[in-house]
Regions:
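Intrinsically disordered, low-complexity segments enriched in small residues
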Residues: 1-78, 82-567
């Protein structure tokens, strides 16, 4: 109905839920109802963290939560860029959007908050939308492409220069509300409990991060550095998770940077600069992330970088999650190639040069032809065509990312137990078991295939708990800040007196609350599951890489016992 109100939350809520994802969860349970994801009663919530808008390194992020139309569970997505920074500097920690507009609309936040009916912008893809709104004022724009308008279940909410709240399909929720965009411009100073000490800490952490080899690698190569690092570990799946037989060097970060004119992109307050912008013809386009290159490269069987750049550009403009889109299309290619699907409405898109993929992406985003079925995601579509569940690369209906569980077994257990579906960012065990650990909080690297001990499973649990704090603070996952510095940053910004033990307990409680909410939304214990497609041994690879059924059952059983013991 266009009503706008501003409310303050009690201090105890901030202490218990921190901000970002945590406060989003609190607001969802406070204002949300058990309803269809596309119901007006399903709120769309955008939040900043206590560090957002401050100079703390790599804190320029925001969180989006709602009930996911893809998983039908609690959906959460995190994005960088400048939107979160501007939201916080406009004087707000977040927003809860109820109902649905009767006409496509835009929310503007600058000196005041207003809702404008803008049917002229409905039908535009994201880049045109962004340009139009920036002509009016230098806004940070968060908005939809055509996929969100058409309620593609894995549509993303784009912002700024190719940044995306990508996973769980929250763009479709935004589209169901007839909300095309939110445009924000903020110039206020974010209050800090102890400004001098906070700035001193910021300098210390920035210096530490800049000197880190991981930071230097990401700055030089972007996230595509994993195309170079992961191949020797068997971590980059090819041929729809059936092997690792691919010329990975053809899509290496070295080749990318030598062939194309590339510049780096920094989100707000970022000291890393992992983003990439590519000059292609007369345009500068957003470069692909590792997950995009891997899912549209080796997973599909394509070594043409030009095609990946083109597809990534279209997917971002249409506003879809590149992981879900890439896994879906790679699965279809495999099913067509092996005769599992012979339907001409699908097989017609696939040939040896992948010339039909561009049309397939556009048809999905536009809900056109077979795209109207494919927009439901891989699991729903594959089951409707008789593909057995164990051959579908999803967990809780969300497509599996590009880190092979057979390379890092705890990553597989993390996929199975994640509250939002297959998710490599809720616990980055592929990094932990390569030595990026935090032993002081029980995150300890170990043998990537020997995981059947309490210490190893607790490493996953502790990593999951700590990730909740990162996503609530909010800090970019690439910034490996020492836990004691995270505690100090939160205390100096909020005035609270957190300890690391208290924050780890908060992380555990947030996961417990998300799981309890998911159960109310229909999740069952059997949904903690990993398909045998990504567990079975690949010919010629070590026996210990396989995750057999009995091992998976044992890991899940002990995980749940240990999770209950720390809750």
């Amino acid at each position: 109905d266009g009503d706008i109100s501003v409310e303050s939350l009690p201090e105890e809520s901030w202490r218990k839920y921190v901000g970002g994802m945590g406060i989003g969860l609190y607001l969802y349970t406070k204002f949300g109802k058990i309803s269809d994801p596309f119901s007006p009663e399903n709120p769309l919530i955008i939040t900043a963290g206590p560090l957002t808008g401050t100079p703390f390194p790599n804190s320029g992020r925001h969180e989006v939560v709602s009930r996911s139309p893809l998983t039908e569970l609690f959906g959460e997505a995190n994005s960088g860029g400048f939107f979160g920074n501007d939201l916080k500097k406009s004087g707000y920690d977040g927003m809860v959007i109820h109902g649905a507009a009767d006409t496509p609309s835009i929310i503007f936040i600058d000196e005041n908050i207003r809702i404008e009916k803008r049917p002229d912008l409905w039908g535009k893809d994201f880049y045109a939308l962004r340009s139009e709104l920036r002509r009016e004022k230098k806004f940070s724009v968060m908005g939809l492409g055509r996929a969100g308008e058409n309620r593609v279940l894995f549509s993303s909410i784009m912002n700024d220069e190719g940044r995306a709240a990508g996973r769980t399909g929250l763009g479709a929720v935004m589209g169901s509300k007839n909300l095309k965009a939110i445009a924000v411009k903020g110039n206020l100073q974010v209050p800090l409990a102890d400004r001098k000490k906070f700035f001193d800490l910021t300098k210390k952490v920035s210096t530490y991060l800049i000197s880190s080899p991981l930071t230097q690698g990401l700055n030089s190569n972007g996230s595509m550095i994993w195309m170079d690092m992961g191949q020797g570990m068997g971590d980059i799946p090819s041929n729809y998770f059936h092997d690792h037989n691919f010329d990975y060097d053809s899509l290496s970060s070295m080749k990318f940077h030598s062939v194309y004119k590339v510049t780096s992109y920094h989100c707000a307050n970022c000291v890393i600069g992992c983003g990439r912008t590519v000059v292609k013809g007369s345009r500068s386009i957003d470069g692909p992330e590792y997950e995009t290159v891997a899912s549209f490269g080796p997973l599909l069987g394509n070594n043409n970088f030009d095609l990946i750049l083109e597809w990534n550009d279209i997917i971002n403009d249409k506003g879809m999650d590149t992981i879900s889109t890439g896994v879906l299309i790679s699965a279809l290619n495999y099913f067509v190639k092996t005769g599992r699907i012979s339907d001409k409405s699908i097989s017609g898109y696939f040939d040896s040069t992948f010339s039909g993929i561009k049309n397939l992406i556009e048809d999905i985003a536009e809900s056109r032809g077979i795209g109207n079925e494919l927009k439901e995601g891989l699991e729903r579509f594959a089951l409707s065509r008789g593909i057995p569940r164990d051959e579908i690369a999803t967990v809780k209906k969300m497509e599996i990312p590009m880190h092979d569980p057979r390379a890092f077994k705890l990553q597989g257990l993390g996929y199975a137990t994640s509250t939002r579906g297959a998710d490599h960012l809720q616990a980055e065990m592929y990094e932990v078991d390569m030595g990026v650990d935090h032993r002081e909080i029980g995150i300890v690297s170990g043998d990537r295939w020997q995981v059947n001990t309490d210490e190893r499973i607790m490493t996953l649990i502790n990593s999951q708990n700590y990730r909740q704090i990162y996503n609530s603070a909010i800090i970019c996952s690439y910034a490996k800040v020492n836990p004691e510095d995270v505690v100090e940053a939160l205390n100096l910004s909020t005035g609270f007196d957190y300890t690391i033990d208290e924050l780890m307990n908060i992380g555990a409680l947030l996961l417990d609350e998300k799981r309890a909410l998911n159960i109310r939304l229909g999740m069952k214990d059997t949904d903690d599951y990993l398909p045998s497609l990504v567990r079975k041994k690949i010919e010629g690879e070590p026996e210990e890489s396989e995750i057999k059924d009995e091992e998976m059952e044992s890991l899940l059983k002990r995980y749940n016992e240990l999770r209950r013991s720390v809750s």
